[in-house]
Amino acid sequence: MSGTFLGFDFGTKSIGVAVGQRITATARPLPALKAQDGKPDWNVIEKLLKEWQPEAVIVGLPLNMDGTEQPLTARARNFANKIHGRFGVAIVLHDERLSTVEARAGLFEHGGYRALNKGSVDSASAVVILESYFEQSF
């Protein structure tokens, strides 16, 4: 097992991406992927999977604060299922509540408003999702 994981923060216009290592329980952002109504360029995802050869892909599951599902929840689950179906990689859905809030706060702390562009926030959210998964799983 490689100990490498990819994390995705699913969105309809942008999908945040992060790569992390189980041994250090840390992740770092990769460039966010553009999406059209939630549909990414699958060739780019294939390249990411070939480059990083992750043990599993962690996809953030957007839930309401009370734990109930919202309209985006089913779309994120569908995105995860498509990754598994197309590429055969193991998928884990991970609760992403407050990941965007935490990501925005961290980016603002390090770069003010200039750091809060959409792609940066989405990939920083993917980092939060992945590191949260590591904390809860290992």
From Swiss-Prot:
Protein name as annotated: Putative pre-16S rRNA nuclease
Location(s) in or outside the cell: Cytoplasm
SUPFAM superfamilies given in the database record: Ribonuclease H-like (SSF53098)
NCBIfam families, per the entry: RNAse_H_YqgF (TIGR00250)
Function: Could be a nuclease involved in processing of the 5'-end of pre-16S rRNA.
Xref: InterPro entries: RNaseH-like_sf, YqgF, YqgF/RNaseH-like_dom, YqgF/RNaseH-like_dom_sf
Species assigned in the record: Klebsiella pneumoniae (strain 342)
Superkingdom in the source lineage: Bacteria
Coiled coil: none
Gene Ontology terms for molecular function: nuclease activity
